[in-house]
């Protein structure tokens, strides 16, 4: 691979860097305890599993765990408010009593995002949030992600395979190849036929859609 999964694991404390530092709000994450990190950044991994009988509301409630001590909440009312908000913003409140195992792929992804939102962080990491989803659910997830950023000021850091989705829904992109960053910046500034050819080894034509670059095979 190009190295994006490794970079994602480094940024989310699943791997330790061999050298250098990774800073979150000016603080080296290597020195953060997991609880401290979880109060600042939430993560939705590409593959997620839950017990078959676990309800949506219970799963989303686990997002409050970083604020609990010995399994007890210091403020149950605040927990309930955050859970209710997370269910509402992801349009999953009607699913709250359903077992997670009974949900569709798109519903499950929104529920996992709801759990991350219940953590009440300013940074949200997403690893391939649209993988294996039908295009309708992909668009629902991407529009939700954009809304979280635009309306609620949450910084979104996500790994995407689809180049056009990356270009359209991102304010800044990082193109990687061979474990190194090839380019980084605004989509419209860094995406060129030469870059695409060198990274993807294909010939593409670049057009503009809503002010964003859109690539088409030629």
Where are these regions (language model features)?
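Conserved ABC ATPase signature
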Residues: 99-103, 107
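ABC ATPase nucleotide-binding domains
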Residues: 198-218
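Conserved ABC transporter NBD signature motif
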Residues: 20-28, 37
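Conserved ABC ATPase "signature" region
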Residues: 61, 76-95, 120
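Helix-to-loop junction immediately C-terminal to a conserved catalytic motif
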Residues: 12
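H-loop (His-switch) and adjacent beta-strand-loop-beta switch element
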Residues: 173-186
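Catalytic Walker B motif of ABC-type/P-loop ATPase nucleotide-binding domains
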Residues: 124-128
